[in-house]
Design a protein with these regions (language model features):
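Flexible, glycine/charged-enriched surface loops at secondary-structure junctions
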Residues: 104-110, 145-147, 214-232, 263-264, ...
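Mobile "lid/hinge" segments at catalytic clefts and subdomain interfaces of large enzymes
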Residues: 141-260, 451-549
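Long, basic N-terminal domains or extensions that often function
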Residues: 1-233
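Long, charged amphipathic helices and adjacent flexible linkers at domain junctions
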Residues: 228, 232-239, 535-561, 609-629
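Single-stranded RNA-binding regions, centering on S1/OB-family and related RNA-binding modules
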Residues: 556, 565-704
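Extended amphipathic alpha-helical scaffolds
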Residues: 1-46, 233-370, 556-570, 578, ...
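Conserved phosphate/anionic-ligand binding catalytic regions in large, soluble enzymes, centered on
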Residues: 28-30, 123-141, 332-355, 436-456, ...
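Glycine-rich, flexible beta-strand/loop modules in the N-terminal catalytic cores of phosphate-handling
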Residues: 14, 26-111, 116-123, 189, ...
Length: 704
């Protein structure tokens, strides 16, 4: 292929797409450049469908290469290993807007791989990977109903910004990843510092205008270098099987769906499946996938009926109204040794969340293409098989678990106290005990309760709710559902999660299964979500309405204070000798930041106080009149006898008490008053030109 270079301007920066020079055997390939950030994206498709598939096997990977920022990977092998959480989350961002645009029944494996080749810190590679995936698929012969466009929207000083740079990202109240076609929004992923529904909607609409330009740009590339789309085999239910199954099962399915109880409905569904399979046992035996086609036909029949009842009658599978939230109950403080604990239950969805407080040294260090940084708040999400009644072995977290954990983390970050206000590392873990939809938002609610139970002084409680959408393509009727359950998520067109406080939004995530939703639906969904969020918050506040005044007795007590950064070496000492001695003597844990912040942690308040006094004595300048607690380290004597005692009153700081300053009375021998090892209280009475310190004894605190 001939090398082609295409250019446009996005968000005030030149965007360059290059095709034809590299990766000639991929179905579609491109290089995306913006400034010094370069991402290569390749799309490939298997020649034949994968046998036994009942879902579209799309694989998306976003690869972070350390050479892109001039680094050699750590570890023994010195090569990239398992994908970072950030890479996994970016893979999900790429996947979600493109997945609905492949034809139904396509079971050929399709892979999209975005490889980061070079990074300018002011230009994030993630959005280039999203744009590149659309380009690679659009110019390939892979069936794809794109293109899509993608942007990041920031909100800085009251102005919306497309693809903000490093400085703008630091100031922004919003980080919004947005993808869509020229007609509609396909994917929304955002974290926000408590902004209103209107501000969020305006940001989405602002970003969509830029997306339209990107889509037009990709369409022009496709027109010039795109391949004709391949004719692929799409699996389809044979018309005679579908007609026969529907005729036999139509009324029976109505009876099944009259069960508002999930368990009873599932039992009835299983019985109907067996009934229909038995009824057609002697029919269609010449069809290779007869059983699969019969069950697929039943599935689509159920889907149509559930959707029709919702859109036309306003009746949901469990009998709720469209805006009705399932019954909620909560409890806190169930686990006695855990720093904070809570259970949040909404219908058949239940999350148990815990909060653990640690020292600043326990923050999570993240290495990647960005500058290494430390994450003080961590939220982790686990969903074992028993939560859905399945016998599945435990395994390490997958992409879904990592994505749900990140969403809850993003939801809660804006309300956490600063490190200066609350010098702790904070970890919340959500264990999903029972699942029937909206588990990620249950984990947001449960974690809020656990944080308050732990005594973390959050700015405001946060709750989350998942919204759903059913859109009838023929009539155009739309139903927006509050607090969707599993069946509504599975059979619906949208899963739109919104988390926030009473004042505004902290996070949203939208997954869409149809070809986009418009402004009117977004407006309606956001307002309905706000009402639902306020209802959920009111239920949570009935259990605990403010953070506890005191931390758990099992949580470490931490104090922080600032010292002169130039004196950190005095605290640490040669080879760590001084700080290790303080730790050994007091039993505390000490962390020191380069900016001069000292953190002291212990379950013993007296030990913290003692360690702080020692450190403050080390760093403060000795002045006449200062009083110190010290230890007698040597009895001073000459040929005339004892004349004083040397006292160490701070690490690296010694002074002498002359025999005349041991008492108001005459003292014959120093050892009549003090001995080596005695703990004494002394006062500085003189500092000479050589910085030698003279002391006066105030009292003997403890004899050796």
């Amino acid at each position: 292929m001939e090398r082609k270079i295409f250019k446009t301007t996005i968000g005030g920066r030149e965007l360059v797409i290059e095709t034809g020079a590299y990766c000639g055997q991929a179905n579609g390939s491109c290089i995306v450049r913006c400034g010094d950030t370069v991402v290569m994206v390749n799309a490939t498709m298997a020649k034949a469908p994968r046998e036994g598939m009942d879902y579209f096997p799309l694989g998306v990977d976003y690869e972070e290469k350390m050479y892109a920022v001039g680094k050699i990977p750590g570890g023994f092998k010195k090569r990239e290993g398992r994908a970072s959480d950030k890479a996994i989350l970016t893979s999900r961002l790429i996947d979600r807007p493109i997945r609905p645009l492949f034809p139904k029944g396509l079971y050929n494996d399709v892979t999209v791989i975005a490889t980061v080749l070079s990074v300018d810190v002011n230009i994030s590679p993630e959005v280039l990977g999203m744009i590149g995936s659309s380009v690679a698929l659009s110019i390939s012969d892979i069936p794809f109903a794109g293109p899509t466009g993608s942007v990041v929207v920031g909100y800085v000083d009251g102005e919306y910004v497309i693809n903000p740079d490093l400085e703008q990202r630091a100031k922004s109240k919003l980080h919004l990843n947005l993808a869509g076609t020229k007609d509609a929004i396909m994917m929304v992923e955002a974290g926000a510092n408590i902004i209103s529904e209107k501000e969020m909607l305006d940001a989405i609409l602002f970003g969509h205008e830029e997306i339209k330009k990107i889509v037009a740009f990709i369409e022009s590339i496709q027109a010039e270098v795109g391949k004709p789309k391949a004719e692929v085999e799409l699996e389809k239910i044979p018309e005679d099987i579908d007609a026969a199954v529907r005729a036999y099962a139509n009324e029976k399915m109505d009876a099944v769906l009259e069960n508002f109880d999930r368990s009873a409905r599932e039992v009835a569904e299983d019985a109907l499946d067996e009934d229909v399979l038995a009824h057609f046992a002697d029919d269609f035996n010449d069809v290779a996938k007869k059983t699969k086609f019969i069950l697929d036909s039943l599935y689509y029949l159920k889907k149509e009926k559930v959707r029709a009842k919702i859109v036309n009658d306003g009746v949901r599978p469990d009998g709720r109204a469209l805006t009705e939230i399932r019954p909620i109950w909560c409890e806190v403080g169930m686990l006695p040794r855990v720093h904070g604990s809570a259970v949040f239950t909404r219908g058949q969805t239940q999350a148990m969340s815990t909060c653990t407080l640690g020292t600043i040294s326990e923050v999570q260090k993240l290495e990647g293409l960005d500058e290494d940084y430390y994450k003080r708040y961590m939220h982790q999400y686990n969903m074992p098989g028993y939560s859905t009644g399945e016998a599945k072995p435990l395994k390490s977290p997958g992409r879904r678990e990592i994505g749900h954990g990140a969403l809850a983390e993003r939801s809660l970050e804006p309300v956490l106290p600063s490190e200066e206000e609350f010098p702790y590392a904070i970890r919340t873990v959500s264990e999903i005990l029972s699942s029937n939809g909206s588990t990620s938002q249950a984990s947001v609610c449960g974690s809020t309760l656990a944080l308050m139970d732990a005594g973390v002084p959050i700015k405001a409680p946060v709750a989350g709710v998942a919204m759903g959408l059913i859109k009838d393509t023929e009539s155009g009727k739309v139903a927006v559902l509050t607090d969707i359950q599993g069946l509504e998520d599975f059979l619906g067109d949208m899963d739109f999660k919104v988390a926030g406080t009473t004042e505004g939004i902290t996070a949203i995530q939208m997954d869409i299964k149809i070809k986009g939703i418009d402004e009117a639906i977004l407006t309606r969904a956001l307002e309905q979500a706000r009402q639902g969020r306020l209802h959920i918050l009111s239920k949570m506040m009935e259990v605990i309405d403010a953070p506890r005044a005191d931390l758990s007795k099992w949580a470490p007590k931490i104090v922080s204070f600032a010292v002169d950064p130039d004196k950190l070496g005095d605290i640490i000492g040669k080879g760590g000798k001084t700080i290790n001695k303080i730790i050994e003597e007091t039993g505390v844990k000490i962390d020191i930041s380069e900016d001069g912040t000292v953190f002291i942690a212990s379950n013993d308040s007296a030990a913290i106080k003692k360690a702080r006094t020692i450190i403050e004595n080390i760093v403060r300048d000795v002045e006449i009149g200062d009083i110190y607690e010290g230890k007698v380290v040597k009895i001073m004597e000459n040929d005339k006898g004892q004349f004083g005692a040397s006292v160490n009153f701070a690490p690296g700081k010694d002074g002498m008490i002359h025999i005349s300053k041991l008492s108001k009375e005459r003292v014959e021998k120093v050892t009549d008053v003090v001995n080596v090892g005695d703990t004494v209280l002394v006062k500085v009475i003189k500092i000479d030109e050589k910085h030698r310190v003279d002391l006066m004894l105030k009292e003997v605190i403890k004899r050796a």
